[in-house]
């Protein structure tokens, strides 16, 4: 029974993790991972996220930081991120609804509320609470003069997914993107199931620890570019390509423009989820002719196995379970 609960938790956390990909393109050298699993103590398992520095190959131009982020973490993690971001000349940040923030690189298309939106609920915020963590949007102060939103709007993504077809009356496309939105805002049946599962985790300290350990193992072990994953239905593969590649292309346009505005001694931080970084690094190195010089690793969150009542045998079993799931997805 206990292992069945672990399996359910594994499926839940794998479904909700914003992480690296499941397969790697064969013709492009793979960047180094932006996540890793560390053991700062004998009984502690920790997820660490990288901030990676890039400088021009010709040594003339501003510094670029690919500041990858985990969307749920400990408060101290986001405090360290805030301190780092506040020190940069410009921060280009992720946010699919740019109109929700006061600073923009450019004016987006008017945002239309997607079908089934429940504005009072966020799956990622609920996930953070269930794990005893905090959600990125609740912990980072975006009201900074150097923070610029650089993302597509919901309507822009819906238009790309529709491929020229008219949108339905409520602004949606009847595509996987709308299904994903309804899961994330809890308005669909599957979203409701996730809500129940998250409450189940929140009510049990040991299951909470197991869920955090599963998330650490899943995010820490996934590598590569998410848009290269094999075996997905065409609609879902297109959705992933839009969510990663189309948004990254939009970001690169803004990044190129901002590089021309700030002095060579300045710096630009690209503040996006870890799943974007593999593709972004390839674009920064090949299109802008930058190369990496250093990494700063920040601990997102940890699990103390001993305090959580997880035995070494159970931890090893969970690690093998997650690794087996990763291997199956990569084979697909």
Write out the residue ranges for each language-model feature:
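Extracytoplasmic/secreted envelope proteins and their assembly/folding machinery
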Residues: 78, 82-85, 249-252, 256, ...
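Boundary at the C-terminal end of the N-terminal hydrophobic targeting segment
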Residues: 17, 21-25
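Positively charged n-region of N-terminal signal peptides that target proteins for export
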Residues: 1-4
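Bacterial N-terminal signal peptides
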Residues: 6-17
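Portal/gating segments that form or line small-molecule/metal binding sites
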Residues: 237-261
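C-terminal soluble interaction/assembly domains
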Residues: 256-259, 265-305
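A short acidic-Thr-Gly-centered motif at the start of a beta-strand
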Residues: 51-60, 253-264
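Structured, acidic catalytic/metal-binding patches in enzyme active sites
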Residues: 24-246, 292-317, 328
């Amino acid at each position: 029974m206990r292992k069945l609960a672990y399996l359910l938790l594994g499926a839940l956390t794998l479904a909700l993790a914003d992480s690296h990909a499941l397969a790697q393109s064969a013709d492009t050298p793979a960047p180094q991972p932006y996540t890793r699993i560390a053991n700062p103590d004998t009984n502690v398992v920790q997820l660490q996220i990288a901030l990676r520095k890039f400088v021009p190959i010709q040594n003339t131009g501003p510094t670029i930081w690919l500041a990858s982020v985990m969307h749920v973490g400990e408060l101290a993690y986001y405090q360290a991120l805030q301190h780092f971001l506040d020190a940069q000349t410009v921060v280009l940040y992720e946010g699919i609804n740019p109109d929700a923030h006061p600073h923009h690189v450019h004016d987006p298309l008017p945002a239309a509320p997607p079908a089934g939106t429940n504005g009072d609920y966020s799956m990622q915020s609920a996930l953070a609470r269930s794990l005893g963590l905090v959600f990125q949007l609740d912990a980072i102060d975006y009201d900074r003069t150097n923070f610029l939103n650089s993302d597509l709007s919901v309507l822009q993504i819906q238009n790309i997914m529709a491929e020229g077809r008219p949108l339905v009356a409520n602004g949606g496309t009847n595509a996987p993107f709308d299904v994903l939105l309804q899961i994330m805002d809890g308005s669909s049946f599957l979203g409701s199931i996730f809500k129940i599962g998250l409450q189940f985790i929140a009510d049990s300290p040991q299951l909470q620890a197991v869920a955090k350990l599963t998330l650490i193992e899943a995010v820490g072990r996934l590598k590569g570019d998410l848009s290269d994953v094999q075996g997905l239905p065409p609609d879902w593969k297109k959705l992933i390509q839009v969510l990663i590649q189309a948004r990254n292309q939009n970001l690169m346009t803004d990044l190129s423009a901002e590089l021309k505005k700030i002095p060579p001694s300045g710096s630009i931080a690209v503040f996006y989820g870890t799943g974007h970084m593999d593709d972004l690094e390839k674009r920064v190195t090949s299109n802008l002719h930058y190369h990496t010089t250093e990494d700063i690793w920040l601990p997102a969150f940890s699990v103390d196995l001993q305090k959580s009542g997880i035995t070494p045998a159970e931890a090893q079993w969970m690690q093998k379970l997650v690794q087996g799931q990763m291997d199956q997805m990569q084979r697909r």
